[in-house]
Amino acid sequence: MTDSVVVIYSGGMDSFTLLHLARARGLKVHALSFNYGQRHVRELDVAADVCRAEGIPHKVIDIRAMSEVMSGSSLTSDIEVPEGHYEEDTMKATVVPNRNMILLSLATGYAVTTGAGAVWYGAHGGDHAIYPDCRPEFVEKMDAVCRVANYEPVGIEAPFMAMDKGQILAEGLKLGLDYSQTWTCYNGRDKACGRCGSCVERLEAFAANGVTDPLAYERLA
C-alpha cells in the first residue's frame, strides 16, 4: 500500500470533505473529476478552483460521449429533476446507469498510472436507498475486482460508507472546512434550488449540525 490515493472529486460536499480528509491523514492526493454530461456541470468549476488553491493535482476527464449509452437520468437527459427527499421513489430518476462502475474503473487506471494504492469515493449511508452503486456490497465487489484487474492491486474505498451526510459535515467542520467552496444542487442554475434531493439532504445536514449553509438558495423546500 502506498501513501498516495486517487479521490473521485465531484465538487460536492461529500467528496470535498473526503479530499481534505485524505490530506489530513498525510496521503498524497490526486483529484479526478468527470464531465459525464451532468446538468450541474458547474460543480467541476468549483472542484477546479479548490484544487488550484490547494495545489492538488487535478484532472477532469470528458466522458460526455458515453451519455449516448447512459441515458434516462434526470441528471444527464431532458428529464425534470424530482423534488423531495432521497427516500422517495421518484428520486430513482437521478440514477445515471452504471455511473460509479465506469468512474471507478477509469480512476483505477489512473491510480495504476500514478502509483496510487487506492481510489476513494464519497458514497455514504444516505445514498443506499436510491443508488445501488453506493451500497456496501457494490464497494466490496469493486474492491475485489480492482485488486486483481492489473499487476498493481488498487483498493476501492468509501470511507463514509457508514455515515450520513450530517456526520460527514461534522467531520469537515472539525477540519475547519469552508463549504462555500462546494456545489451540491442537481440543477445547473446560478443559485441552488433548495428543493431537489441533493439540496434537501444538504440542508438537513447543516441543520443537524446547527450551522448555517453558506450557499445561496432560490427558495427553501
Swiss-Prot record:
GO biological process: any one? queuosine biosynthetic process
What catalytic reaction does the record list?
A: 7-carboxy-7-deazaguanine + NH4(+) + ATP = 7-cyano-7-deazaguanine + ADP + phosphate + H2O + H(+)
Sites where the protein binds Zn(2+): 185, 193, 196, 199
What Gene3D superfamilies does this protein map onto?
Answer: HUPs
List the Gene Ontology MF annotations in alphabetical order: ATP binding; ligase activity, forming carbon-nitrogen bonds; zinc ion binding
Needed co-factor(s): Zn(2+)
**This protein's pathway:** Purine metabolism; 7-cyano-7-deazaguanine biosynthesis
Amino acids binding ATP: 9-19
| EC nos | 6.3.4.20
Q: What InterPro entries does UniProt report for this protein, alphabetically?
A: QueC (IPR018317), Rossmann-like_a/b/a_fold (IPR014729)
Q: How is the cofactor bound?
A: Binds 1 zinc ion per subunit.
Keywords (A to Z) from UniProt: ATP-binding, Ligase, Metal-binding, Nucleotide-binding, Queuosine biosynthesis, Zinc
Q: Does the UniProt entry include the keyword Protein transport? A: no
NCBIfam families hit by this protein: 7-cyano-7-deazaguanine synthase QueC
As for family, the record states: Belongs to the QueC family.
Function, please?
Catalyzes the ATP-dependent conversion of 7-carboxy-7-deazaguanine (CDG) to 7-cyano-7-deazaguanine (preQ(0)).
Name listed for the protein in its UniProt record: 7-cyano-7-deazaguanine synthase
Q: Organism, per UniProt?
A: Marinobacter nauticus (strain ATCC 700491 / DSM 11845 / VT8) (Marinobacter aquaeolei)
